[in-house]
């Protein structure tokens, strides 16, 4: 190969390398970080309040579900005139491009629990998964008086040395549904802190001060039902806040009375190798109901 040919080949190689570098930077720029994902949550809430789904940066084939049913974006709660309260708790997962928010809204003067998940790809909303809980009849439990502000535990930002890895957090969080599957958190050795607590629809169901059931003041050792038919999927891991979000269907036998099952959006505060708290929104659904994303 002549010197001229060698120089030409080298120049072509440098152009290719430069193109690759620019492409990689452009791809990195498309990554939606924490603030970006929080912004999408705020945009979604603003559009919902304005009843204007067209204002959302949604993909042309966005999938939207509410209460496990596939709907057209703009249906369901979007048709109601709602207002905000002070309660908003976000779970942010930049690695998955996922943002979740637990809200307490007001509809016709009554409190409503609302939770939704957004999937962001290339600065577009591609998935919206949501649940609306209007009162005790729908939720089995309903105590909005305990959801005025985010709890101190959930608001706590763990120090870097307290945080567990993403994989460790998931492994610890799934001991909750696995414990329900066998009817014991002790049997699966769920790493619950001695003062761990659990709220469901604002009702204290486990931990210090719990009187709902006998022995519920200890989350790990309390008596729980055996829910062999439980199904679950991990939705998001907030590695900065130490929170894992899991959606569950508790399956047969999960209601206090009557037919049906309990559909649950759970979140677990995890750091220092322990589960410190669990907070969830729950809704009764007909037996055999799928999540809508199978």
What does each model-found stretch correspond to?
Residues 1-10:
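Bacterial N-terminal signal peptides that target proteins for export
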Residues 25-294:
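C-terminal and inter-domain tail/linker signature
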């Amino acid at each position: 190969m002549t010197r001229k040919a060698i120089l030409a080949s080298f120049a072509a190689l440098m152009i290719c390398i430069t193109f690759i570098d620019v492409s990689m930077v452009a791809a990195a720029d498309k990554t939606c970080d924490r603030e970006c994902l929080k912004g999408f949550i705020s945009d979604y809430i603003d559009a919902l309040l304005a009843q204007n789904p067209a204002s959302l940066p949604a993909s042309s084939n966005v999938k939207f579900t509410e209460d496990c049913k596939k709907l057209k974006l703009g249906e369901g709660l979007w048709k109601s005139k709602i207002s905000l309260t002070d309660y908003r708790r976000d779970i942010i997962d930049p690695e998955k491009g996922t943002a979740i928010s637990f809200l307490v809204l007001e509809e016709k003067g009554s409190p409503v629990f609302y939770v939704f998940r957004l999937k962001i790809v290339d600065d577009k909303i591609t998935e919206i998964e949501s649940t609306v809980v209007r009162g005790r009849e729908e939720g089995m439990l309903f105590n909005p008086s305990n959801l005025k502000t985010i709890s101190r535990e959930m608001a706590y930002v763990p120090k870097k040395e307290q945080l567990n890895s993403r994989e460790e957090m998931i492994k610890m969080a799934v001991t909750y549904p696995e414990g329900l599957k066998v009817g014991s958190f002790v049997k699966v050795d769920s790493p619950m802190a001695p003062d761990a607590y659990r709220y469901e629809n604002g009702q204290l169901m486990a931990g210090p001060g719990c009187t709902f059931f006998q022995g519920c003041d200890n989350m790990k050792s309390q008596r729980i039902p055996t829910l062999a038919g439980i199904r679950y999927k991990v939705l998001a891991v907030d590695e900065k806040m130490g929170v894992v979000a899991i959606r569950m269907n508790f399956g047969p036998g999960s209601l206090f009375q009557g037919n049906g099952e309990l559909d649950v959006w759970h979140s677990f505060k995890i750091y220092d190798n322990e589960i410190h708290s669990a907070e969830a929104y729950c809704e009764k659904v007909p037996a055999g109901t799928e999540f809508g994303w199978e």
